[in-house]
Amino acid sequence: MKRIIVTREKKIASALMLYWVIPGSKQAFMQQFGLVGDLTEHDAFGQPLYRIDIAVLDANGARIKNGEQIALDLNDSVFSVFACTRSGSLSNEVYLQSGQLVGGIETYYLKMTTKGGFKTVSYPWFE
């Protein structure tokens, strides 16, 4: 078993945005749900064009709020994680290699921030 502890940094630009931490291959997820590219498009008013349903995100990942920390226990077969916004913008993919042993469990500490902002699309990013 593996455990990831994700801490999401507080950012004003994404204060009201939920992110989902999704275990598994980003490429496989994109292919399964027909996502092209990492970021969503915007309409003429600057609002994101949603390209994925919340039910899909809830079924495949765990929600994380601004400034929150979550812990997820994963199967040994999971080798990477990434994050997704409500609108379908995707983060970079983090590969889980050489975690610390804490109580006999391979543990990874991940810090998530937000890139983009007020004039461009906000999206999650693992540092």
Describe each model-derived feature in a short phrase.
Residues M1-E127:
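Short loop/turn and low-complexity linker motifs enriched in small/turn-promoting residues
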